[in-house]
């Protein structure tokens, strides 16, 4: 029996990874990454950088991508809960513009592997969340781009958000930085030829 269950999402290139957790009176243990299991599942990746962020409830980050240096990402929540989203922006892909969203939490211990060629973002659902991710290429700030989090063409069903009003269902305001508020819609990026 493998040490993790690797589940292909409906969009090619996206995978949910569920670990096999060994738990007893001392606590628990599980593998968060096993190259042999990943390669056996057809996921041959090489990570160059690990990142960690902490966010309060209502923080929405994204939707980010790098044009010339696309990054694959293996993401998980170390504390709290997040709704994590990947949008297919691969030129010629039959699922271009479609998204997959997954809830990641410290409790479910799921991970989400996002192949290069996707825009990525997440919303913090708990009072606080610590988010960790491994990437396959280095961060290149001059190459960073993004798509509007509420682009109607993509139609992400963000949980616990009251429409596009900028608040969560419990009244918590969305916290989105100025840069992420200014990202264009996918259609505008297509017109400008960014995905050719």
Task: Place the predicted regions along the sequence by residue.
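Non-catalytic, conserved peripheral segments adjacent to functional cores
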Residues: 1-107, 126-128, 135-196
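Short beta-strand His + acidic residue motifs that chelate non-heme Fe in jelly-roll/DSBH
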Residues: 112, 120-125, 133
